[in-house]
């Protein structure tokens, strides 16, 4: 309790430390950053706190509190990811995770299953939409004020391990028990793909993850086989993801040597010019792209490439305005930083990053 109170008491100092010029992270994690006077000053301050402060404090905890403040002073998209959160953050874009294959909402402080993934671990044992989860591995979770993120941590786990669920079902007065073996759960990024008329296919992409291009291409091929000659790509609400997925998708619609995106950074290896290679399967198809104020980053790269090459009709609202490219670097303690390393520009030279 003593250490906890001391850590809280030092939060104002932590915030002040985070504003000191020179990034302390570089001192410890990168040989690219010179040892500036600001970095030496911050290192000395932390050393003095650790050795001379009247009460014992946890320097690691102070540093954990400092790093997010430091990153927040760069730009809106550079961020620190604690080790405890890195797996969940990566899973969202990696295309799969190990879990039980359900989605849920909290209704009256109770986990309520609203979707069971077909063929997933939960469906195999008989869990159904509408089921309410009362216990997880003999721990009461209903009515306990447990937040969604903690429920997710309890349900996810290593592939092949088991979790026991106590379920209440509307047509039963008894608590039903299910042992579910965790398995790989796909994270689909194409929400929908269907014909809206005999010659027009509609595809909705919710994010740009590692599997997005293959999902997207497979959807287009199936729609083309069903008669589609033209397509509507819905990127509304798509906040972005991996830039290379947007580039690969754009390549499917552009003739050879069409500019797709330029990136410009501080270092030479963060600058690039990307052009289509002419191997796209849908170069002759008409395309409409739907965007809104939540379409960002990779969505804007794709839409910008289509617009500046006069390749598609862009319909909707002004997009979000995220023209910064981040690189994720894993640190020795398994935490990570996502650091902005370049700005991207559409083929006509526009950088759509809004002011910050």
Where do the PLM segments sit?
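Hydrophobic alpha-helical transmembrane signal-anchor segments
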Residues: 3-31
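Cleft-lining beta-strand/loop regions that shape enzyme active-site pockets
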Residues: 17, 25-38, 46, 50, ...
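Membrane-proximal extracytoplasmic alpha-helices
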Residues: 41-45, 62, 69, 93
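An acidic helix/loop motif centered on a single conserved Asp/Glu
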Residues: 57-75
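PDZ/PDZ-like peptide-tail recognition elements
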Residues: 65, 76-115
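Structural motif
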Residues: 130-132, 350
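Short acidic, Pro/Gly- and aromatic-enriched capping/linker segments at domain boundaries
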Residues: 333-342
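Conserved functional hotspot residues or short segments at active or partner-binding sites
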Residues: 347-356
């Amino acid at each position: 309790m003593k250490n906890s109170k001391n850590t809280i008491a030092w939060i104002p100092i932590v915030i002040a430390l985070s504003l000191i010029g020179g990034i302390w992270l570089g001192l410890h994690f990168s040989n690219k950053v010179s040892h500036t006077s600001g970095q030496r000053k911050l290192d000395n301050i932390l050393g003095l706190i650790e050795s001379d402060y009247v009460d014992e404090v946890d320097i690691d905890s102070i540093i954990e509190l400092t790093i997010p403040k430091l990153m927040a002073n760069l730009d809106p998209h550079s961020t620190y990811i604690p080790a405890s959160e890195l797996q969940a953050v990566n899973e969202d874009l990696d295309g799969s995770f190990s879990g039980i294959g359900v989605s849920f909402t909290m209704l009256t402080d109770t986990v309520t299953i609203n979707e069971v993934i077909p063929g997933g671990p939960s469906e195999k044992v008989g869990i159904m939409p509408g089921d309410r989860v009362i216990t997880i591995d003999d721990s009461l979770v209903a009515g306990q004020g447990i937040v969604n993120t903690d429920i997710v941590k309890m349900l996810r786990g290593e592939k092949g391990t088991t979790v026991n669920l106590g379920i209440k079902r509307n047509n039963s007065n008894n608590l039903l028990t299910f042992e579910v073996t965790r398995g790989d759960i796909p994270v689909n990024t194409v929400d929908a793909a269907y014909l809206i008329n005999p010659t027009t296919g509609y595809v909705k992409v919710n994010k740009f993850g590692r599997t997005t291009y293959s999902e997207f291409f497979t959807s287009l091929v199936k729609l083309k086989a069903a008669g589609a000659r033209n397509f509507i790509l819905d990127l509304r609400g798509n906040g972005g993801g991996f830039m290379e997925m947007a580039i690969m998708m754009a390549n499917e619609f552009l003739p050879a040597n069409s500019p797709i995106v330029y990136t410009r950074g501080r270092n030479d290896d963060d600058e690039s010019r990307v052009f289509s290679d002419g191997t796209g399967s849908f170069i002759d198809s008409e395309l409409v792209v739907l965007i809104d104020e939540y379409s960002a980053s990779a969505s804007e790269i794709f839409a910008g490439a289509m617009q500046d090459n006069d390749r598609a009709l862009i319909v909707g609202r002004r997009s979000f305005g995220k023209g910064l490219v981040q690189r994720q670097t894993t640190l020795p303690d398994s935490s990570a930083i996502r650091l902005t390393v370049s700005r991207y520009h559409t083929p006509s030279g526009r950088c759509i990053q809004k002011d910050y």
